[in-house]
Structure formats: structure tokens, C-alpha cells
């Protein structure tokens, strides 16, 4: 803490001090609220809505509204908001992030700003990380809102569209971040306005905001359909990847190195950058790939797919580790969440990486999916008019919240003083010595009946420690992605005396570890971290499992100089110093320099990861601007706007661009290439082909006018073919929707391909993001032209039908995130089954197989 903070307090302390008058004003209404009957308390909601309509603001109503909720919670749940919870509620209402330690009652805090903002009638979304929490909080906290006359809904993974629509129509809706994002994407794929489920995005409160907006920010939400691509190339590239030799680079190719003309000397066929998780082929490797596939130049556009797939295969073999990043179960690759350690059923890596891992592990390679719609959480949550968030750990990422989301973090004081002792890290030379020390620490705590929670980063480490503890005869539970069905049971027992629990990061959130009296006497829950995580935030979460609500406890991390964190990001000079000290085996190293090195290594990684996410946002911002234009266009069509003028503009634009492309102003009409013009325009607009006689003596602008006149007359003739004008208006909407969706889906794939290949621009001393923006702009314009041409072509060549129905361009086959991994119920038949020899239900007197059964078979 610097001198300024010591004298004036931290920024959070100053912010809390600033809002204390509001807190005191809220508390001053307590006696007034207590005197009201239930009916009078409920009537307050109507009163506040009326006052809002008369010009008062939410800030004017805040103290009284918060006091109303406080009294309602006391009557309905028997829980009264502490002063620190009122502070948290004000921070959330202001669109900021409240950092509240684990066990401080964040769930109850959300009721205050949710009620206040719901008074506007525009809807409030309370966002949780899984279905279980959404359902639990809606049933539990929802009682308070319902008591006060507001409606409460919950959106769960297995709900039908009409149930979702009803839930989003409520004043307050509890929903997971994944369902919220997917519903937004699905709403922008519907073909009738009545199929929309969401309202406008007004205000949201995000629980565990760091998990949603930072940990998951690098994984976009993707809705996919089946692709027609073969899976053979993945298997072929996997064979080649195993034949290529891993090499080293003399140093990293930075922009400055490229400008200075420094040469990077690379050995082997490919080099791996573990820090940035990137694989690159060397010159030697490129030649080997070209020879293997019998191609001349791997960099040619037609070889982009081979280039992409060989890099995927090398990533699968060198950066994706079994039992750490994924597990193989029932001939299937299941992803392990790196932050929680949980298996994520139904979720697949995008862009072909999942298929590359399937080929590596020799399980059935599933067909690659085609992206139909996609958005990142960064761009999705920035669509809200206002958003607030809660978490136990956010201060370390405050810069990111501020830069990307425009939100600041305020640390809320705890209700009771934290009693947990956080001890200095214990550092050892090797992993073997470190694990021996961990086992000794567990034995020592176990001897005095103190419960121990050992946190590991990988499944492999948890299983190694389990074997070591077994040899020592210490009974323990293991909690990792492989055994997560038992999670609730194991966590419930983790605070009991003598309990020893080994857990990957999954034991983190939404679960309470309660101590018994013997455990409390023995010093509370002892936390042992076996490795520092890349993020200080995840380490703080592990520590936060102990010492809830003033309970005793202690925490310590055990580290070795061989850990990935120290190996990749620790200072080499420092490592050499400690290596040369000649430390004896099993001796613990303690030095301020070492603690600083660990802290610096984590800061370096956090900065690195922030850079990756910021870079992703730079690219995705381009996609986002294009997505906004396309979705806005779609929404106009859905809203039933008359598209006649838009279609006429498309026709005239096509005539203008075709004429400009084929005819030059400074050439005589006799020199114009009429064949080129006729070949280009007549498949789209069926005009009479231009002849030399027709254009003789005319200027280009006059030709444009002649062609436009004929095109408009042709369209008017098409209009006259329809009995009702509205039939053609609906047809225009149907065709336009179909063309927009079809072209947009192809464009998403093209943009992804562009992003994959754009990194090479850095070698040419050009900024990849600038190049990406320029290429993306050109591609987007081409797509718009293509939409216009296809729409006009289809409308000119359509045959009149009495019934016009809209249909989706592509069938959705899945998403890349699944909140509910629970078993699905089998589909039940609504009517009795009709067998081939039964009498036909239509009443014809024939057997079913000779009547309607035959028709059904043909379909």
C-alpha cells in the first residue's frame, strides 16, 4: 500500500465512504417500513412506478425502495440485509462491480438493485453460471420479488421457446450467461417476429462476473449446423504431424525485431510458443508438408485448408494435453474447463481443433460443424444499457474491466473480520520435493484433526497426490473432472474434522464448506495449493474456500522451480541463482526475491492473457459492427416493413454497378463490350440483351436510364402476376431473409479463415489488425452485393404460388456450450402406434400399409 493510500484510504474505501449517506438514509426508513402491513408494503411497488412516471428517477427512489426490499426479505426469508450488503446493492445499481468475499451473501445483495431497476418495466436479467444456481436463486430470492408484486421468471436449458418468451417477459429473469447469449443469437435467426423470445437488453446483474467476462471471454458462443466437409484430412494431417520434428527458435519474432531486420534462426520442422499457445511451421517444415501433399506452394489460397489443418494437428499433439485440457470417455473427447476443472459435456472446440484431437486419440472423428451464428460475451454484454456484477475476486483484473467494459471495481468491506492466516509460499527445487512436503503438511494437520483441502491444477497431479497419501495410510476424497458426480457430497464433508480433500479448481464456486466444532478448535480449514495458477484471481478463490464469515483457517502454496509458471515466465537469471546455491534435497527455499519473482510471473501472464483478449476484441469489433448491420436489416424485415422501395433500390444499384464495370465514360459506345454486360446482367435481371443499334449514339448515363426503365417495367409486370400485392410483399421478405442468412453464414466462415491467415502480415511489417479491417470491409461489401444480386435474381424468376411460407436456411444441430449435462428423457409418442396391418385411421376401410401408410413411406 502506498503512502497516499495509507493517508487517504484506498480508492474502494473512498468510494464506500462517498455512498454511506445513501446507506444511512436507507436504514432510516426501517421503522417506517416495519409498521406497514403486508398489503401496504406490496402497494409501495405501485407507488414507486407512479412516481417514476411522474418524473422521479431511480436514484431518487433508491433509499426507500431498498428499505422496502429489506423489510420484505425479513418477512419472507427471515433474512435482513447487513449494512455491507446495502453498500453492494448501491454499487450494482450504479453499473459497477462489487467485490464481496466468499460467504458474504451476494445472492441476497442482488435483490436490492433488481427490484429498483425492475420498476421501469423494461426487464432485469440476473445472470448466473449454471442452471442449478439460476433455478435455486429464482425459487429462493424470487419469493421476495413476488411478495412485492413483481413477476419472476427463470430460463433453463431444456425449456421450449414459449416458456422462454414468458420468462423473459417477467419483471426479473434468472438465466445463465450461455442461455442468454444463445437466445440472442437464435432470435436473430428466426423467420417470424412471433418467434422472438427476448425483449431489448436493458439491465443485468452478473454473478461471478470475472468468470463470465474474463475467463470465458476468449471462447465465443457458437450456434452450428452440419457441414458438408469430409473428416479425412484430419486423419491424414495427424499422420504427418507425428512425422514432423519439433525445433526451437533463437528468439521471438516481434514487430521491432522485424523492423530491425533481425533474423530468427529456427531448427526442426515446427516451433511451439507455449506462452502464447501458438505453433508455427519452419521453412524446413513447409517444404516437408508441400512434399507430403504434392503441392507447389503451401501459402497459395487454394492450400489454406491444408495449412490450417496441419497447424491444428500440431496444436493437438503439442499444446493440448490429455487429462488436463480434455479427457477421453466412451470413445469421445470431453473438454475440461481450465478454470473450474469441470468436464463440459456437449461442448466442442471450434474451428476443427476438436476433430484434430479426435484424430490424435484415435476416436471417431465427427464431421466439422458450420457456424451459423456467433458472438463473444464481451460484445454481447456491452449491448446492455447498464450492467453490474458481483464476485469474490475482481480487483486484480480491474484494468480489464475498465478498459473493455467501462466498469470499475469497488471492494466491499466484510461483515466480520477475516480470521484466515495466509502464509508465505513454500518453494522447493524440484516437483518431487514439493509433493513430499505437501504430504508431510497433510499428515501434520491430519494428526491434530484439522480438515485439509488440497488444490491442484491438473487431474494428473490430483491422482499422483492421491497415490502418495494412500501409501501413507491417510484416508481422503478426490474431486476432479473424472468424479464430479460426487461433488456436492464431498464438498459438504470437506470442513469436518479429519477430512482430507484433493480437488482441482472445480471445488471453487457456489458450494459452502461448513466447519464442525472439532475442526474449528483445530484451526479451521487448511488450504494447500500445489501450484500457483496463471491467474492470481484463481489462487485467491482457492484461499477464499477457508475463513468464511469470520471462521478460522490458513492457506499456503507449495511451489517448485520446475512448475510451468516458473519454467515459462520466471526470470532465468533468478532460477540460475537458486540453482547455483547448492540447496540440499527437501530443503525449503525462502527469499523475498523468489516471492517477488512468482508475483511478477503471474502479473506477466495476466498481462499476456489480457493482451490476447484485447486482441480478440480488436478483431471481433470488426465482426460486431458487421453483425449489427445484418441483424438490424433482418429485424426490419421481421417487423413487416414494406420492402418494395428497398428492392427497387437494389435493382437500380445492380444496373449502376454492372454498367460502370463494363462500360467506360471515355470510350465510344461502339467500343463497349456488350457481350460482357449482357452475360453479367441478364441472369439477374431478364432484360432484352443490349445490341449495337440500341446503344448507338447514347452515353453511359443514358444507357443506365434505359436499362433501369426496362428493369422496373419487368418488375411491375411480375407484380401484376400476383392476385394480391401483399403476396409479393411477403415474398420479398421471405427471399431477402433467405439470402441474408445464407450469405451471412458463409461470410462468418470466410472471416474466420481470414483471421487464421492474417497473422503472416506481421512478417511483412504490416499491422495484422489494420489488414484484417481492410480485407473484412471489402469482403462485407462483396457479401452485400451478393445478397442484392441473389435477392433480385430470385424475385424476377419466381413462379406465383398461392401460399408463401418462410423457412430456415440451415438446420441448427448444436451449440458449443451446454449448461445442463443431465440425462434427457426419451421422447414419448402422443398417439397410439398404427401397425401396417391395422385398419387405416382415415376410415377408408383399407389396411394402413395399403392406404395412408404407403403415402407416409413415400414422404
What is the role of each PLM region?
Residues 326-334, 340-347, 549-550, 557, ...:
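Extended, charged helical/alpha-beta scaffold domains that provide interaction surfaces
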Residues 1-582, 631-632, 648, 653:
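Conserved P-loop NTPase motor core
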Residues 110, 438, 825-827, 835:
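Active-site-adjacent structural elements in folded domains
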Residues 830-849, 853:
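Short Cys/His-rich zinc-binding micro-motifs
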Residues 448-462, 639-640, 692-696, 841:
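Short, Lys/Glu-rich amphipathic helical modules
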Residues 27-31, 617, 778, 838:
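Positions in alpha-helical segments
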Residues 454, 502, 744, 780, ...:
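Hydrophobic, well-ordered secondary-structure elements that form the walls
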Amino acid at each position: 500500500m502506498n503512502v497516499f493510500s495509507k493517508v487517504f484510504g484506498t480508492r474502494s474505501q473512498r468510494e464506500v465512504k462517498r455512498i454511506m449517506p445513501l446507506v444511512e438514509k436507507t436504514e432510516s426508513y426501517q421503522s417506517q417500513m416495519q409498521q406497514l402491513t403486508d398489503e401496504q408494503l406490496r402497494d409501495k411497488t405501485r407507488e414507486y412506478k407512479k412516481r417514476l412516471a411522474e418524473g422521479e428517477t431511480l436514484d431518487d427512489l433508491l433509499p426507500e425502495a431498498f428499505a422496502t426490499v429489506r423489510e420484505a426479505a425479513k418477512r419472507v426469508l427471515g433474512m435482513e440485509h447487513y449494512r455491507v450488503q446495502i453498500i453492494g446493492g448501491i454499487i450494482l445499481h450504479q453499473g459497477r462491480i462489487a467485490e464481496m468475499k466468499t460467504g458474504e451473501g451476494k445472492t441476497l445483495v442482488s435483490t436490492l438493485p433488481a427490484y429498483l431497476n425492475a420498476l421501469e418495466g423494461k426487464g432485469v436479467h440476473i445472470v448466473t453460471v449454471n442452471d442449478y444456481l439460476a433455478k435455486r436463486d429464482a425459487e429462493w430470492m424470487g419469493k421476495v420479488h413476488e411478495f412485492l408484486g413483481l413477476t419472476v421468471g427463470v430460463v433453463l436449458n431444456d425449456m421450449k421457446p414459449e416458456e422462454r418468451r414468458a420468462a423473459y417477459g417477467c419483471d426479473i429473469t434468472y438465466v445463465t450467461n450461455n442461455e442468454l447469449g444463445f437466445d440472442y443469437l437464435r432470435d436473430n435467426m428466426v423467420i417470424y417476429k412471433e418467434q422472438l423470445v427476448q425483449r431489448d437488453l436493458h439491465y443485468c446483474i452478473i454473478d461471478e462476473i470475472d468468470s463470465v467476462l474474463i475467463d470465458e471471454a476468449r471462447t465465443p458462443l457458437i450456434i452450428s449446423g452440419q457441414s458438408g466437409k469430409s473428416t479425412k484430412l484430419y486423419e491424414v494431417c495427424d499422420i504427418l504431424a507425428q512425422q514432423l520434428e519439433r525445433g526451437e527458435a533463437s528468439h521471438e519474432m516481434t514487430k521491432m525485431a522485424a523492423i530491425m531486420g533481425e533474423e530468427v534462426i529456427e531448427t526442426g520442422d515446427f516451433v511451439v510458443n507455449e506462452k502464447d499457445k501458438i505453433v508455427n511451421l519452419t521453412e524446413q517444415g513447409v517444404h516437408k508438408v508441400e512434399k507430403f501433399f504434392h503441392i507447389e506452394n503451401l501459402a497459395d489460397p487454394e492450400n489454406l485448408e491444408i495449412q490450417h489443418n496441419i497447424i491444428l494437428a500440431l496444436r493437438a499433439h503439442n499444446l493440448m494435453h490429455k487429462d488436463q485440457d480434455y479427457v477421453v470417455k466412451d470413445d469421445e473427447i470431453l473438454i475440461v474447463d481450465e478454470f473450474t476443472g469441470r468436464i463440459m459435456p456437449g461442448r466442442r472446440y471450434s474451428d476443427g481443433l476438436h476433430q484434430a484431437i479426435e484424430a490424435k486419440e484415435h476416436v471417431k472423428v465427427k464431421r466439422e460443424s458450420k457456424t451459423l451464428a456467433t458472438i463473444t460475451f464481451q460484445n454481447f454484454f456491452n449491448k446492455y444499457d447498464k450492467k453490474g456484477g458481483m464476485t469474490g475476486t475482481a480487483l486484480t483484473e480491474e484494468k480489464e474491466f475498465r478498459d473493455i467494459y467501462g466498469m470499475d471495481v469497488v471492494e466491499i468491506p466484510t461483515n466480520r473480520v477475516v480470521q484466515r492466516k495466509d502464509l508465505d509460499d513454500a518453494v522447493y527445487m524440484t516437483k518431487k520435493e514439493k509433493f513430499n512436503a505437501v504430504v508431510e503438511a497433510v499428515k501434520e494437520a491430519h494428526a491434530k484433526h484439522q480438515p485439509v483441502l488440497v488444490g491442484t491444477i491438473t487431474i494428473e497431479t490430483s491422482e499422483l497426490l492421491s497415490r502418495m497419501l494412500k501409501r501413507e495410510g491417510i484416508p481422503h476424497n478426490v474431486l476432479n473432472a473424472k468424479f464430479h458426480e460426487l461433488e456436492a457430497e464431498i464438498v459438504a464433508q470437506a470442513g469436518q474434522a479429519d477430512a482430507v480433500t484433493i480437488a482441482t479448481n472445480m471445488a471453487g464456486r457456489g458450494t459452502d464448506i461448513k466447519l464442525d466444532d472439532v475442526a474449528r478448535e483445530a484451526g479451521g480449514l487448511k488450504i494447500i495449493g500445489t501450484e500457483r495458477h496463471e491467474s492470481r484471481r484463481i489462487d485467491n478463490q482457492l484461499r477464499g474456500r477457508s475463513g468464511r464469515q469470520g471462521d478460522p483457517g490458513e492457506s499456503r502454496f507449495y511451489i517448485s522451480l520446475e512448475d510451468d509458471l516458473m519454467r515459462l515466465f520466471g526470470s532465468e537469471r533468478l532460477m540460475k541463482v537458486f540453482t547455483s546455491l547448492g540447496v540440499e534435497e527437501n530443503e525449503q527455499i525462502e527469499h523475498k526475491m523468489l516471492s517477488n519473482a512468482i508475483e511478477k510471473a503471474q502479473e506477466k501472464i495476466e498481462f499476456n492473457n489480457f493482451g490476447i483478449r484485447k486482441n480478440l476484441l480488436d478483431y471481433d469489433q470488426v465482426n460486431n459492427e458487421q453483425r449489427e448491420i445484418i441483424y438490424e436489416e433482418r429485424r426490419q424485415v421481421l417487423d413487416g416493413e414494406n420492402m418494395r422501395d428497398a428492392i427497387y433500390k437494389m435493382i437500380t444499384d445492380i444496373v449502376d454497378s454492372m454498367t460502370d464495370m463494363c462500360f467506360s465514360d471515355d470510350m465510344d459506345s461502339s467500343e463497349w463490350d456488350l457481350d460482357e454486360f449482357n452475360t453479367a446482367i441478364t441472369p439477374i435481371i431478364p432484360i432484352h440483351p443490349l445490341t449495337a443499334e440500341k446503344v448507338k449514339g447514347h452515353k453511359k448515363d443514358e444507357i443506365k436510364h434505359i436499362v433501369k426503365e426496362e428493369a422496373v417495367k419487368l418488375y411491375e409486370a411480375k407484380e401484376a402476376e400476383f392476385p394480391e400485392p401483399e403476396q409479393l410483399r411477403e415474398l420479398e421478405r421471405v427471399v431477402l431473409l433467405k439470402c441474408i442468412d445464407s450469405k451471412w453464414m458463409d461470410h462468418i466462415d470466410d472471416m474466420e479463415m481470414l483471421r487464421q491467415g492474417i497473422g503472416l502480415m506481421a512478417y511483412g511489417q504490416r499491422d495484422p489488425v489494420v489488414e484484417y479491417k481492410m480485407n473484412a470491409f471489402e469482403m462485407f461489401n462483396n457479401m452485400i452485393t451478393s445478397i442484392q444480386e441473389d435477392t433480385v435474381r430470385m424475385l424476377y424468376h419466381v413462379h406465383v404460388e398461392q401460399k408463401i411460407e418462410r423457412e430456415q436456411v440451415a438446420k441448427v444441430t448444436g451449440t458449443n456450450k451446454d449448461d445442463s449435462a443431465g440425462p434427457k428423457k426419451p421422447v414419448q409418442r402422443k398417439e397410439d402406434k398404427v401397425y401396417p396391418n391395422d385398419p387405416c385411421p382415415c376410415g377408408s376401410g383399407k389396411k394402413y400399409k395399403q392406404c395412408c401408410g404407403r403415402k407416409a413411406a413415400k414422404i
